């Protein structure tokens, strides 16, 4: 029997402030980004997960840093910063045979929750950024695939609050995330949307 879950690590106003400060940087400058993350008190991933707080946790996602809240952040100078804050997944003895998020510091999981709860967590973070930045430049929804990408174009970067397939599960599960994406990086990834491509090149 498949058990449905949604896990979340909240994005509060303080974290939004921190992310918007990072969005002012050149995300292709790995040294500057790393220095700002150290100033923010975001330890390196290996340092954090090697500490006592994670001693009894199962495998956690690989990243470059961990926020004080518990988010796993990837920012390695390629023009992006990726911060997942919610996961939608099943525990059925296949890919997962236990609820891995229940014991991860900063995260809570809800058994029996599914898309309405997952979408609500995403909408909450969208609203937090809307409160700071105003209405988004794009709000792209793909109902067939249950995805939504909301984006704001800033001077140097784009802020995206997105949801979609989670790559570490071979797209079996989904995540909701904040993505900072450089408008100048040559090899920065694009969402599968002409509107998103137009956003970045306009």
Predicted regions and their residues:
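Short helix/turn-capping signatures at newly exposed starts of structured segments
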Residues: 1-147, 154, 159, 164-202
């Amino acid at each position: 029997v498949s058990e449905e879950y949604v896990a979340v690590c909240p994005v509060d106003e303080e974290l939004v402030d921190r992310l918007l400060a990072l969005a002012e940087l050149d995300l292709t400058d790995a040294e500057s980004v790393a220095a700002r993350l150290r100033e923010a008190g975001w330890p390196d991933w290996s340092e954090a997960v090697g500490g006592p707080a994670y001693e009894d946790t199962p495998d956690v996602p690989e990243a470059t840093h961990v926020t004080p809240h518990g988010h796993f952040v990837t920012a390695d100078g390629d023009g992006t910063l990726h911060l997942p804050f919610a996961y939608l997944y099943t525990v059925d003895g296949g890919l997962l045979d236990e609820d891995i998020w229940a014991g991860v510091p900063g995260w809570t999981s809800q058994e029996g929750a599914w898309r309405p709860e997952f979408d609500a967590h995403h909408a909450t973070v969208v609203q937090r950024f809307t409160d700071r930045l105003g209405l988004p430049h794009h709000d792209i929804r793909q109902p067939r695939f249950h995805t939504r990408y909301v984006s704001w174009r800033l001077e140097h970067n784009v802020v995206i609050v997105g949801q979609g397939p989670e790559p570490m599960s071979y797209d079996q599960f989904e995540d909701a995330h904040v993505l900072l994406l450089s408008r100048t990086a040559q090899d920065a990834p694009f969402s599968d949307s002409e509107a998103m491509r137009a956003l970045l090149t306009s």
